[in-house]
Amino acid sequence: MNTFLMFGTYTAAAEKKVSSKRTKHANAIIKSLKGRVVAEYAMLGKPDLLLIVELPDVKDVIKASIELSELTGISFTTEPAVTVAEFDKLFKSIKK
């Protein structure tokens, strides 16, 4: 599984539709793509929302972003992430 940070920005219309039902539906979208939601955070400022998700690959996170935007009206910017331990291994493998 790959880890992705999904930063969400609410539109005025999206703010009006905030509900636990919509959150459950959003989580079901991630699960349907064989992924899982690791954590969800509401934030102050921009962005408004952070989802930490695990999905099989980048194609799946693209699908998730599109489906979540269609469902919620939230615009997402997504970044891949690796643990520091994984980063250290990658760095060591190219530094000789």
For every predicted segment, state its role.
Residues 74-96:
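C-terminal end-helix/capping segment
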Residues 9, 52-54:
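Short hydrophobic/aromatic beta-strand micro-patches
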Residues 34-37, 73-75:
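A generic structural signal for alpha->beta connector loops
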Residues 55-82:
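An amphipathic, aromatic/His-enriched active-site/gating alpha helix that lines ligand/cofactor pockets
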Residues 1-32, 36, 44-47, 88-96:
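Short S/T/G/P-rich N-terminal loop/turn motif that feeds into the first structured element of a domain
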Residues 41-46, 82:
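A short beta-turn/loop motif at secondary-structure boundaries
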Residues 38-42, 66:
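Short, flexible, solvent-exposed loop/turn segments with mixed acidic/basic and small polar residues
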